[in-house]
Design a protein with these regions (language model features):
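Compositionally biased Ser/Thr/Gly- and acidic/asparagine-rich
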Residues: 1-394
């Protein structure tokens, strides 16, 4: 099957006509980091390795005049001469610039090999768009030291697929280029569901995935995610192995370091009292869950801090921690992008576990503002208590 490529109201310039004339096929200006719409399809032709972004509504049986048309299964086809031999493309010469690149081969390719042989490109990660993430797709950062994706729910790995485009970043302010060689092909690998997940690594990490409550209940896709990697004596500043964040159409979760927004950050081992802030924006739902996996976080206890509720939730090491929260767009503090962070405390200062059946608060509700708390079996000399109403307000 084929798909509609739109960009005019009357079908000129090789486009399918739509009432709005809105474009659906785009290129990317690497030097200026800006998308631009393709101006025609009757003169321009596809070139192996040249990347595009295309909105896929479905195959050509759908009605493009209706926004509510149901999507259909679509197969993209291209014809032409196969690209063989070395394929080199010059890229932006500005440090940290995102460069849109395409796999020129009709074969799976190992991006570790590609970037190792390229010039002045960051070899630590690359970025792909996964249409299976969230409801409209989301950017995924692949850590090339492990092949692991962030968010972790993606099937993306270090192997770029035939026909797939991706982003890489320029390392320093100097000439940069990407080189694909025949020896980069990974013919023994299987296709991923992005267009097999790698084994998870065994270092100290905190993987934070965001999911709507509905998607969580129905085993759906992640909305977005971020990854913290902890390595002894690593720098807490911004370096090449820290992956900048690409913003999504919908929910976007970033790690904040100074003025930098990251999808992966490599840091020194966590210290007591250290705070790592997050930036979470573009809420599309009201009810969410964080799925936070800690691996080998030793010597400290990590807490998820919720500034809106005034809570600190301890995170269990080497387990998945599922934490529900909700937002209300009418409440600015509720949807504040800086609402959440992670902090660390001495793991020896463990909180006493309280059986909820031994706890009572009455009268509830109270009309006088006074109430009694009863806690059976507690030997504590002093207790600090925070009380919240049904809306989550303290």
């Amino acid at each position: 099957s084929w798909l509609h490529i739109t960009g005019s109201t009357d079908g000129r310039n090789g486009f399918d006509a739509t009432p709005s004339g809105n474009p659906s096929l785009f290129g990317f200006d690497n030097a200026n980091e800006a998308w631009f719409s393709i101006d025609n399809t009757d003169v321009n032709t596809l070139v192996a390795g040249e990347p595009y972004r295309v909105f896929v509504r479905g195959d050509r049986t759908i009605d493009v005049s209706q926004n509510s048309s149901t999507a259909t299964a679509t197969t993209l086809r291209a014809t032409g001469t196969l690209a063989t031999g070395d394929q080199t493309t010059n890229l932006a010469n500005t440090q940290d610039n995102f460069n849109f690149i395409g796999n020129p081969y009709q074969a799976i390719v190992d991006m570790n090999l590609v970037l190792d042989n390229s010039t002045n490109l960051n070899t630590n990660q690359y970025y792909v768009w996964d249409p299976n993430m969230n409801t409209q797709g989301a950017y995924v950062t692949v850590d090339l030291s492990t092949g692991a994706p962030t968010p972790s729910g993606s099937a993306a790995n270090q192997f770029i697929q035939p026909g797939q485009a991706a982003f890489v970043t320029t390392l320093t302010n100097a000439d940069a280029s990407i080189l694909f060689e025949e020896s980069d092909k990974a013919t023994g690998e299987s296709m991923t569901g992005v267009f097999r997940n790698s084994d998870q690594f065994n270092t100290s990490t905190i993987n934070i995935d965001l999911q709507s409550q509905l998607a969580y209940a129905n085993n759906g896709s992640m909305a977005d995610g971020a990854l913290l990697k902890f390595v002894a004596n690593a720098s807490n500043g911004i370096e090449a192995n820290d992956a900048a964040k690409l913003g999504n159409i919908d929910e976007t979760l970033s790690i904040v370091n100074g003025g930098h927004y990251l999808s992966i950050e490599t840091r020194d081992l966590p210290q007591i009292g250290e705070v790592i802030p997050f930036y979470l924006s573009n809420y599309r739902q009201e009810d969410y869950v964080f799925r936070i996996n800690l691996n080998n976080i030793n010597g400290v206890t990590a807490y998820l801090v919720d500034e809106y509720l005034g809570t600190q939730t301890p995170l269990v090491n080497n387990e998945e921690n599922v934490i529900s929260f909700n937002v209300n767009e009418a409440d600015e503090e509720s949807v504040s992008p800086t609402r959440f962070s992670i902090t660390f405390a001495d793991s020896n200062l463990a909180n006493t576990t309280i059986d909820k059946n031994s706890f009572a608060l009455y009268p509830n509700p109270t009309n006088t503002g006074e109430f009694t708390i009863q806690l059976a079996g507690s030997s504590a000399d002093r207790l600090d208590v925070k009380v919240f109403d049904m809306l989550g307000k303290q």
